Amino acid sequence: MKSAEIREAFLRFFEEQGHTRVASSSLIPNNDPTLLFTNAGMNQFKDCFLGAEKRAYTRAVSSQKCVRAGGKHNDLENVGYTARHHTFFEMLGNFSFGDYFKRDAITFAWTFLTSEQWLNLPKEKLWVTVYATDDEAYDIWTKEVGVPAERMVRIGDNKGAPYASDNFWTMGDTGPCGPCTEIFYDHGPDIWGGPPGSPEEDGDRYIEIWNNVFMQFNRTADGVLHPLPAPSVDTGMGLERVSAVLQHVHSNYEIDLFQNLLAAAAKAIGCSNDGQASLKVVADHIRSCGFLIADGVLPSNEGRGYVLRRIIRRACRHGNKLGAKGSFFYQIVAALAAEMGEAFPELKSQQAHIERVLKAEEEQFAKTLEQGLRILEQDLAQLKGDVVPGDVVFKLYDTYGFPMDLTADIARERELTIDEAGFEREMDAQRERARSASAFGMDYNSLVKVDSATEFLGYDATEGQGKIIALYKDGQSVDQLGEGEEGVVVLDRTPFYAESGGQVGDTGFLQAGAARFDVRDTTKTGGAFLHHGVVTSGALVIGSPVEAKVDADVQHATSLNHSATHLLHEALRQVLGEHVQQKGSLVDSQRLRFDFSHFEAVKPEQIKQLEDIVNREIRKNTPVETELTDIETAKAKGAMALFGEKYGDTVRVLSMGGDFSVELCGGIHAKRTGDISLFKIISEGGVASGVRRIEAVTGAAALAYLNAAEEQVKEAAQLVKGNRDNLIDKLSAVLERNRQLEKQLEQLQAKAASAAGDDLSNAAVEVKGAKVLAARLDGQDGKALLALVDQLKNKLGHAVILLGSEHEGKVVLVAGVTKDLSSQLKAGDLMKQAAAAVGGKGGGRPDMAQGGGVDVAALDQALALAVPFAEQGL
């Protein structure tokens, strides 16, 4: 069976057993900061197992894409060198949320694996493990399924602590846990290894293909296991492993999924396809890189982006090792999309984007790869012992972009190891330097702990009545705030919007009788809204009723900018591609700032396209509509959700232009798109690797920006004695005239230099049969001095020349040595001495060198070095 057929058979089998087919979740875990990447099928169901989320089904089946290449689950260094380690793999899984338990889970697994209708694996090839004390599972396997006792293995606490076992699963030190049962396939006696639980279990003969986890306990802090009221099941079967079994091969790299990728990799690199480890690395890495980029990850220097960069660069290095010339890695994306695009359509829809990102990263790394490898080879040649020092590993990382594991990979090929501890010390020192150079403000919200929640009135009003339920000063709870005191006011009800989703918090004032509190900002902690500000008159007391009034003009201007960010977000996806994801935003009354994932600068013509699309939607003047619904319904309607945002059971869906823009958003917005009036982008640039930023203005601010630009055009026209209509022609004429004058000036300078050369040649002194000339020609630039040195070398014939000039407040130096002397005297060596004398640097070829410095007063002293330099070298 082909891998695609196995995947579909698994999903169809469990659908027939009443399971709901659930699509693979993103490789970016949603709302789980503990995970770098999705690494198991159960990740997307974590809240279901914890009881925090209820879904419309209690049985589920999925084929989950997974990555293990960072953090705790890191297989990167072994990939390519073993039969089963991968950065990307598919986990087939069936799940029960308080529905069926051990008997059904075991029966389902055995039926699918062994029945003729499905995989038809020989039963005598299958071994089973259970947790040592799980008699229930053992009896089901032996008495009901019929697995003989000689192929059953009980596994106890083999990891040095209670319940620390290969056959006991825990989510952490406390929480849901339970025993598991695993199914192993015996590849036969011609492969070394022993059954699970034996001393030889790490061999490759017996390979785990299925794991059933039975979540039946809750472990408390005292280590006691308490039965869960509704036990659940989490299972996993690696698609690559079971494909190897069914296709009668031992290594995962021999299955159909990899054969086409290996062939494509060999073709792109220009090498043979004969099982080299480096080729396996490339074939594996194209899968993880392709899927990560499709899910919105871009190469960067931190977090998920850095893991992606590490994988790409490891693949590039292995391709380079196989003889690749130029960029090759991106060329394999087409084969990946052809192989897996039916099951994962994002590979096809984003193929061009994935290729562009990989090609750009390859080209960037190529600039430093060769130089970095050369430096590493030099360091390894001088190495005493078999450990590469941490400072060498850090230098390669910091200067040449070599991730630590890439250097470790190269060291491994030479039977060397790296000093990881030393590398981490260097990294810590760098982080400390960065911390010392930064100043961090206090997070005031973290000081304020409020149990009560605030009812928000602001979607429908900018004024409202509330009651003071808490007061804070300097982070401490107080009973009252007096005149002139700064603090935080918490109300039971408020029309003030709290900073969220990039929109700044509202400003305004609170009135409590004679007391007034000017609100300078509004934030939120938990469900409480914090009004930050100062008492300008009277005193505020807990329990007092207040009149809350938002600065409606400021809020209105802010709301227009917020609505414009939604239109811009969709426009970006239309113009640049669906890979664009919001990475951050700041929306206030003056302008909007929108950060998004993209790998290159936005072109001027694309900026115009973005403005045209947004302004077209503004002119349509369609209503801005909101709807409260559940998260699944919202996503089914195409609503975009932001990665990392936590959404409750009920979400607010905001639609603009019908279905032009549909996003989950709790912010304040325009009533109609026409309220925005006008949209104008004022800047675009990069803020981090793979992240771009657009700043824009709307409405009156956009009009003011255009008016200011119009005034600048008028002023420019006046300067060239023209008008708006002929400004371009006038400017072109001025620039052309300037170019002509510069050319004439260069010609005059060349003539002057030539004349000076005739005079200077007479000033040369003879040193051991050679002519040595050192001269100062202030006002000449480097280009003029170079031409003059060439002229003097021809005139003098057998010479050492050093010329210097004070030019625009700095020292310019040029040194020359005729070729007949360049084996004895190097112009670059002379330049290093002279440049150092004027506080600068320089270097070059043996016959010609350039340099400079900042110490003009030392120029004559530097020129005086020419004669002793020649005397010592000749």
UniProtKB/Swiss-Prot annotation:
<dbReference type="InterPro" id="IPR009000">
    <property type="entry name" value="Transl_B-barrel_sf"/>
</dbReference>
<dbReference type="InterPro" id="IPR045864">
    <property type="entry name" value="aa-tRNA-synth_II/BPL/LPL"/>
</dbReference>
<dbReference type="GO" id="GO:0006419">
    <property type="term" value="P:alanyl-tRNA aminoacylation"/>
</dbReference>
<dbReference type="Pfam" id="PF02272">
    <property type="entry name" value="DHHA1"/>
</dbReference>
<feature type="binding site">
    <location>
        <position position="562"/>
    </location>
    <ligand>
        <name>Zn(2+)</name>
    </ligand>
</feature>
<dbReference type="GO" id="GO:0004813">
    <property type="term" value="F:alanine-tRNA ligase activity"/>
</dbReference>
<dbReference type="GO" id="GO:0008270">
    <property type="term" value="F:zinc ion binding"/>
</dbReference>
<comment type="similarity">
    <text>Belongs to the class-II aminoacyl-tRNA synthetase family.</text>
</comment>
<dbReference type="InterPro" id="IPR018163">
    <property type="entry name" value="Thr/Ala-tRNA-synth_IIc_edit"/>
</dbReference>
<comment type="function">
    <text>Catalyzes the attachment of alanine to tRNA(Ala) in a two-step reaction: alanine is first activated by ATP to form Ala-AMP and then transferred to the acceptor end of tRNA(Ala). Also edits incorrectly charged Ser-tRNA(Ala) and Gly-tRNA(Ala) via its editing domain.</text>
</comment>
<keyword id="KW-0030">Aminoacyl-tRNA synthetase</keyword>
<dbReference type="InterPro" id="IPR018165">
    <property type="entry name" value="Ala-tRNA-synth_IIc_core"/>
</dbReference>
<keyword id="KW-0820">tRNA-binding</keyword>
<dbReference type="Pfam" id="PF01411">
    <property type="entry name" value="tRNA-synt_2c"/>
</dbReference>
<dbReference type="InterPro" id="IPR002318">
    <property type="entry name" value="Ala-tRNA-lgiase_IIc"/>
</dbReference>
<keyword id="KW-0648">Protein biosynthesis</keyword>
<feature type="binding site">
    <location>
        <position position="665"/>
    </location>
    <ligand>
        <name>Zn(2+)</name>
    </ligand>
</feature>
<dbReference type="InterPro" id="IPR012947">
    <property type="entry name" value="tRNA_SAD"/>
</dbReference>
<dbReference type="InterPro" id="IPR003156">
    <property type="entry name" value="DHHA1_dom"/>
</dbReference>
<keyword id="KW-0694">RNA-binding</keyword>
<keyword id="KW-0479">Metal-binding</keyword>
<dbReference type="GO" id="GO:0002161">
    <property type="term" value="F:aminoacyl-tRNA deacylase activity"/>
</dbReference>
<keyword id="KW-0862">Zinc</keyword>
<dbReference type="GO" id="GO:0045892">
    <property type="term" value="P:negative regulation of DNA-templated transcription"/>
</dbReference>
<dbReference type="InterPro" id="IPR018162">
    <property type="entry name" value="Ala-tRNA-ligase_IIc_anticod-bd"/>
</dbReference>
<dbReference type="GO" id="GO:0000049">
    <property type="term" value="F:tRNA binding"/>
</dbReference>
<dbReference type="GO" id="GO:0005829">
    <property type="term" value="C:cytosol"/>
</dbReference>
<dbReference type="InterPro" id="IPR023033">
    <property type="entry name" value="Ala_tRNA_ligase_euk/bac"/>
</dbReference>
<dbReference type="Pfam" id="PF07973">
    <property type="entry name" value="tRNA_SAD"/>
</dbReference>
<protein>
    <recommendedName>
        <fullName>Alanine--tRNA ligase</fullName>
        <ecNumber>6.1.1.7</ecNumber>
    </recommendedName>
</protein>
<keyword id="KW-0436">Ligase</keyword>
<keyword id="KW-0963">Cytoplasm</keyword>
<feature type="binding site">
    <location>
        <position position="669"/>
    </location>
    <ligand>
        <name>Zn(2+)</name>
    </ligand>
</feature>
<feature type="binding site">
    <location>
        <position position="566"/>
    </location>
    <ligand>
        <name>Zn(2+)</name>
    </ligand>
</feature>
<dbReference type="InterPro" id="IPR018164">
    <property type="entry name" value="Ala-tRNA-synth_IIc_N"/>
</dbReference>
<dbReference type="GO" id="GO:0005524">
    <property type="term" value="F:ATP binding"/>
</dbReference>
<keyword id="KW-0547">Nucleotide-binding</keyword>
<dbReference type="InterPro" id="IPR050058">
    <property type="entry name" value="Ala-tRNA_ligase"/>
</dbReference>
<keyword id="KW-0067">ATP-binding</keyword>
